[in-house]
């Protein structure tokens, strides 16, 4: 089956696993999904991730993170730029999510960056998702 938006599929799988408090989940791997998982790990939204080779495209196993009382670290995920409606921003228009409590993930000419990194580098790009 052909998937029209693999990034939205990844975010939905994370959201669903998080809602039922699963420890881990698996998604078909790609370079951009690995970079998004790396940002989520670096920003403290997931515990870890690993790439598993399966002689096809590979699998990305993501380990979710919860607080000491089993509260969710990720309270929301939203896909912004979709295949039917791409959303681009200039360097001075890079959005803040919940006044800095969340992150915006952007695809730029310098790779996949958070909103903070994009502002520091003075670059805009396609707004992939918001995470808070």
UniProtKB/Swiss-Prot annotation:
Keyword Transmembrane helix: no
A Pfam family recorded for this sequence: Ribosomal_S8
Keyword Ribosomal protein (UniProt): yes
GO molecular function per UniProt: rRNA binding; structural constituent of ribosome
Gene Ontology biological process terms in this record: translation
UniProt KW keywords: Ribonucleoprotein, Ribosomal protein, RNA-binding, rRNA-binding
Taxonomy, superkingdom: Bacteria
Record SUPFAM superfamilies: Ribosomal protein S8
One GO CC term on file: ribonucleoprotein complex
Family that this chain belongs to: Belongs to the universal ribosomal protein uS8 family.
Function: One of the primary rRNA binding proteins, it binds directly to 16S rRNA central domain where it helps coordinate assembly of the platform of the 30S subunit.
Assembly: Part of the 30S ribosomal subunit. Contacts proteins S5 and S12.
Protein name: Small ribosomal subunit protein uS8
Organism: Geobacillus kaustophilus (strain HTA426)
